[in-house]
Amino acid sequence: MKKQIVLLVLLVAFALPAFAQRDTIRSNKNEFSFGYGYMPSSSFRWGGGLHYYPEMDYFGSFYATYTNRLTKVIGIGATYCFDPRILNYSEKNQPICRLNESSYTLMFHLKINWLNTKYVNLYSKVGQGIMTWNYHLIEYQPSLYQINMPSNDFIDRIDYAYQFTPIGIEVGTKQYAGFLQIGLGMEGMISIGFRYGIIDIDKE
């Protein structure tokens, strides 16, 4: 609960200057974004009772978002994230197992455009939702080491998901733009991608 309150307070702090903005230039009613994020929060969610996997061959989040702009400043939408990773576990340099794990996330988000120019857009975003994950254990050698794996019950594999992006930048045209954002959550600490906006014909 404290985490949700902190996210809300931070969002309001970033949103206040945006509400005073009136001379926005770029605005699409519907926007789609596709990105890749480095080090999503699912990659460091391990808690007490779970084993630590010191070697990670690969991790990162691939995500897609849809945003419906209520105004030129405020947009709401949904985000889907897919986070595959391969982890190796060893004891004293002796390989024990290889773990293929994936996370699947659905979040609803609020996006605030607090600076708009013809070719550059700055924004902040916050999202909350749920995450589920699964895993597949391969190359396991139980004779060397016994591993207490997480529960296979679906209800035990559901967790809280979030994304807080204090700063993001889009560079391009009203319809096509690349973006870079810095934040914390399921979209990664640093992420890059592409944004496509559907231009309203009646506004052209």
What is the predicted role of each segment?
Residues 4-14:
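Sec-dependent N-terminal signal peptides
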Residues 72-76, 118-120, 173-178, 200-204:
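Repeated loop/turn-to-beta-strand initiation elements of outer-membrane beta-barrel proteins
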Residues 40, 60-141:
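Gram-negative (and chloroplast) outer-membrane scaffold detector with strong preference
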Residues 16-20:
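Sec/Tat signal peptide C-region and signal peptidase I cleavage site
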Residues 48-52, 92-99, 150-155, 177-179:
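Extracellular loop and loop/strand-boundary signature of outer-membrane beta-barrel proteins
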Residues 21-68, 195-199, 204:
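Short glycine/proline- and aromatic-enriched beta-strand/turn motifs that initiate or cap beta-hairpins
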